[in-house]
Amino acid sequence: MTDYTTLEDLEAAIARELAYMDFPPKDWMLEHQHPSGDPVYDVVIEGAGMQGLAIAHALIRQRVRNVMLLDENAVGREGPWITYARMQSLRTPKIFVGPDLGQLNLAVRTWYDIKHGKGAWDKLVKVPKDEWMDYLNWFREVLQLPVENEVTLKLVEAEGDFLRLTIEQGGATRTIYARKLVRTAGIAGCGGKHIPAIVSDGLPSDRYAHSADMIDFAALKGQDVGVIGCGASGFDNAATALEQGAKSVHILMRRKRLQTVVISRAMHSVGYLQHFGDLEDAQRWEIMNHFSGFTPPPPEETLARTTRHDNFHLRADSSLNTVGMTGDKVHVETPSGPIDLDFLICATGFTIDVTKVPELTPLAEDIMVWRDRYDPPAGQENPDLGLHPYLGRNFEFIAKNPEQSPRIADIHEYGIASISSLGPICTGLHGMAFGVERLVRGITRDLFVADGDAHVAQILNVNEPPIAPDSEEDWTI
């Protein structure tokens, strides 16, 4: 670890370190302009959470500086950490390499030790989520990353050699152009929240919510609350309701017992994180089809937040037979018996379906999904998995007809929808270093190759004066 004692000292060291790492110190990107005369961004990143910040940092380190991040949230509220993430700490063990991408002075551990005193990091088991948000705010500020907040991407269209992006800010819409779009729109960003139809059809909208909604838990004080789903998010929401004074909280799960196997841990190795995307289609499908049958159990500390309360109930074998209103109560019939509640929280995950992403409407029908590419053998059918986008090696969408829709490959889906194609390298922190490197290498390759003729012409027309022997540009060995 470093011996810096103040954040000012650390930030000065980071500036020196970035200058040292800036090699070769030569700009290589060519400026592009739309026929209208409007400027064109090389890369626009939708989402300025931890993934978007890491990607922008990595691109700028590669001297791709004409970058813009757009986020619909206010400054300091990007991502889920202080909105709908209801855990107390990150679920990932603190050994991860985060958006620092291996640069120790930028790492959360270095920042945390300076903020809280030397040795504070060693006492942590996992990073508190509020501290993580503070770190991301500092990370963005110290790197001076270009973020526009409270901006919503409304529409993505192909226009000539570029992507035409319609954005909304402060009630007004405008158009910007980009050569590349990276979507880091979060876990709900490729299809939306999944609410079981039996719930949405049977209840008024003020009697249920999705676990990723902004829920007024204080209003649930003294009420009977049900939570559908026994994953970590379900337990986080149950614990929050209990801590806010709910009369009782009932987790309703289909399974007969709580699952204990964390199958995803088997994929947390260099082999899987680096090369899952290089496996054959049949191998990737078999793994992901098997994976989809498991619900990750809550971490031990999350489970303890609920079980310490006498008014917490875990109801196994409780799939939903009927859901409706009986008087002023939410009445639920399950195989294990009926239950009357005041409010229902659906920790039921997210839909992955590009046709349900509003901003992709003009292009969605031309985006290849797994069912277009792969026909699974008997016994491995999985309609939900078949709707996942079939991505290229660098997270790019693939067009069903590339000649008719060439710009589709300039949209990179860096989120939960990529897991079937490239593995768990952008759905959390454990794979961040692998995912960002793969994405950025692909983007820089595409941008360079697209300007190939111009780069060739530059070399053929080199006519520079001799370089002095002691010049920093003299690379002669």
Can you describe what each PLM-predicted range is?
Residues 76-86:
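Core mature regions of organelle-targeted
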Residues 86-118, 265-279:
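Flavin (FAD/FMN) cofactor-binding and adjacent substrate-gating region
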Residues 1-73, 78, 121-232, 236-244, ...:
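Flavin (primarily FAD) cofactor-binding/catalytic cores of flavoenzymes
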